[in-house]
C-alpha cells in the first residue's frame, strides 16, 4: 500500500527570485487548493467528509493556531506556528494528502488538484498593493500531448511559468499559483532553503515595526497664556466736541457703545418756529408763517351785549377771512418778508361825494384784532347796510358798495400769513369821486358771512373803479 511520495509538480521547481516587500495578507493557503483536493479524494473513495479541529495557543495578543484533520479514522496535524485559522487548516490538509499518497497503491487513482480562479484574483490584488502593473498571461499550445497548454505570467518584471494543462483557463490558474508560491517562499525564507511542504508558517508582520529606527521626539512647544484677551484696546476719535477716553479698559462718560465702530457725532435738528420765513425761489407761491400775537382776543359769536361801538357777529358765522385763489395770483417775491396790513381807524373821517356835499362818516370801532384761524381759508367781510346812515348816491342812484373779489385781485396763497386789516382814513378814488361808505351806528353793524370780500387791492363793481389808500407796515 505504501507508495513512494509523488514528486512535486513542475510549477514548484521555479526558483526565480520574488520581489521584496511581499505582504502577509496574500498567502497561498487562501487558494483552498489542498482542502479542496482532500475533499474530492474523500468523495471518490467513499469516505466521510474530513473534519478539522483547530486549536488556539499562545497569548491573546499573539495567538498561534494549530489544526488537525480527521479522515478515514486517521488524524493529521498541521505545522505549528500559524497566525490564522485558515492557514493552519490548509497545512493540515496538505500533510494529510502527502501521507495518503505514500499509503495508497500505485494503481489507485488520486484525483488531481482542482485549481480555482481565486489564485488569479489574489495575484492581481497583490500587484495592486505593490503598485505593479496588472499581471499579463501568455499561453502557448504544443503540437500534441494530453496537456498542450502552458501559460506564463509576468508580474513585477518577473515571469513565472505554470504547469501544463488541458485547457487555457487551467493553464492561467496554474501560472498564477506558481507565482504566489514563489512570492511566499522568497518572503518567508526558510532556513534550509527548501521544504517538502508548500504551506509553511510565516513571520509576524508586527515584528518588522520594532526594527524601525526610533525617531527622536520633538520638544513640545510651550503654549503662551491661554487666557490672553484676543482683542486690543479700542480707540475712538473725537468728533464734534464729544470725546471718548479709555484708560486701563475703563470707559468714561461719552462711550455709549462697547464696539469697534467709531461714534458718529450727534446731529441736532432745529425745528422751524412759527415765525420762520421760508423763501423758495423756485416755487410760484411762497409760504409765510407768522405766529399770532398773544394779545389777540377771540370774537365771541354768541354774545349779544357787547360794547356800544362793537360790531355784532352772527352766532352761526365767526369772524373769518377767506382767501380764495384768483386766476391772476400775485407771487410773493423770494426775499419779501411777511407783510402785515392794517386799516387804521381815522378820526372825523369824511367821504367826498361827487356833485354833492361830503357827508360825515362815523368811525367804526375796532375791537383789538380778530383771531384768524390758522388752518382755515381767509374770508372777506362785507359791511352790511345801516339803518340811519346817509347813503351817498353816485349818478343819482342808490347803490350799496360791496367789496367783492375782482378777477385781477391779488390774493395771497392759502398758506400765506393772515393779515390784520384796520380801517383807514377816507378813501378817495383817483378820479376824485369818493366811494359810498355806510355809517354804522351802535350795535347795528353785522358781519355777513354769505357774501365775502377780499382784503388787499379792492376794486368796486361800479363804472368807475374806486381806489383805497392802504398803509403797509
Swiss-Prot record:
Name of the protein this chain belongs to: Double-stranded RNA-binding protein 7
Region listing for Disordered, in residue ranges: 1-22, 286-329, 393-473
PANTHER family, alphabetized: DOUBLE-STRANDED RNA-BINDING PROTEIN 1, RIBONUCLEASE III
Gene Ontology annotations of biological process type: regulation of gene expression; RNA processing
Pro residues biased stretches: 1-10
Compositional bias of kind Polar residues: 433-450
One GO cellular component, as annotated: nucleus
Pfam families in the record: dsrm
Amino acid at each position: 500500500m505504501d507508495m513512494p511520495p509523488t514528486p512535486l509538480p513542475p510549477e514548484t521547481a521555479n526558483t526565480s527570485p520574488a520581489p521584496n516587500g511581499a505582504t502577509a495578507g496574500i498567502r497561498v493557503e487562501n487558494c483552498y487548493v489542498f482542502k479542496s483536493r482532500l475533499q474530492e479524494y474523500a468523495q471518490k473513495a467513499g469516505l466521510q467528509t474530513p473534519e478539522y479541529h483547530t486549536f488556539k495557543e499562545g497569548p491573546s495578543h499573539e495567538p498561534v493556531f494549530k489544526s488537525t484533520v480527521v479522515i478515514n479514522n486517521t488524524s493529521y496535524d498541521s505545522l505549528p506556528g500559524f497566525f490564522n485559522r485558515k492557514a493552519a487548516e490548509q497545512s493540515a490538509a496538505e500533510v494529510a494528502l502527502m501521507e495518503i499518497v505514500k499509503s495508497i497503491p500505485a494503481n489507485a487513482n488520486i484525483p488531481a488538484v482542482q485549481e480555482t480562479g481565486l489564485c488569479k484574483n489574489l495575484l492581481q490584488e497583490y500587484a495592486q498593493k505593490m503598485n505593479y502593473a496588472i499581471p499579463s498571461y501568455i499561453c502557448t499550445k504544443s503540437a500534441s500531448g494530453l496537456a498542450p497548454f502552458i501559460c506564463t505570467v509576468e508580474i513585477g518584471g518577473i515571469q513565472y511559468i505554470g504547469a501544463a494543462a488541458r485547457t487555457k483557463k487551467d493553464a492561467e490558474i496554474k501560472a498564477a499559483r506558481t507565482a504566489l508560491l514563489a512570492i511566499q517562499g522568497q518572503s518567508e525564507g526558510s532556513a534550509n532553503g527548501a521544504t517538502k511542504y508548500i504551506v509553511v508558517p510565516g513571520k509576524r508582520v508586527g515584528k518588522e515595526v520594532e526594527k524601525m529606527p526610533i525617531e527622536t521626539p520633538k520638544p513640545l512647544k510651550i503654549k503662551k497664556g491661554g487666557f490672553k484677551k484676543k482683542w486690543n484696546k479700542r480707540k475712538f476719535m473725537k468728533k464734534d466736541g464729544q470725546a471718548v477716553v479709555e484708560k486701563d479698559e475703563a470707559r468714561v462718560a461719552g462711550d455709549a457703545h462697547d464696539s469697534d465702530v467709531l461714534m458718529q457725532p450727534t446731529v441736532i435738528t432745529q425745528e422751524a418756529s412759527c415765525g420762520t420765513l421760508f423763501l423758495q425761489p423756485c416755487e410760484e407761491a411762497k409760504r409765510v408763517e407768522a405766529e399770532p400775537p398773544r394779545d389777540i382776543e377771540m370774537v365771541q359769536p354768541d354774545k349779544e351785549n357787547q360794547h356800544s361801538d362793537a360790531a355784532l357777529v352772527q352766532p352761526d358765522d365767526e369772524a373769518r377771512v377767506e382767501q380764495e385763489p384768483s386766476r391772476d395770483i400775485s407771487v410773493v417775491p423770494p426775499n419779501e418778508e411777511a407783510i402785515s396790513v392794517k386799516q387804521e381807524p381815522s378820526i372825523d373821517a369824511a367821504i367826498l361825494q361827487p356833485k354833492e356835499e361830503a357827508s360825515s362818516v362815523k368811525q367804526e370801532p375796532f375791537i383789538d384784532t380778530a383771531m384768524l384761524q390758522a388752518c382755515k381759508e381767509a374770508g372777506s367781510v362785507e359791511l352790511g347796510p345801516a339803518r340811519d346812515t346817509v347813503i351817498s348816491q353816485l349818478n343819482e342812484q342808490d347803490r350799496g358798495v360791496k367789496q367783492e373779489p375782482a378777477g385781477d385781485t391779488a390774493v395771497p396763497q392759502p398758506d400765506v400769513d393772515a393779515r390784520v386789516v384796520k380801517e383807514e382814513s377816507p378813501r378817495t378814488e383817483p378820479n376824485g369821486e369818493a366811494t359810498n361808505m355806510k355809517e354804522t351806528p351802535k350795535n347795528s353793524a353785522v358781519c355777513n358771512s354769505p357774501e365775502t370780500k377780499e382784503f388787499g387791492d379792492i376794486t368796486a363793481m361800479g363804472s368807475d373803479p374806486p381806489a383805497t389808500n392802504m398803509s403797509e407796515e
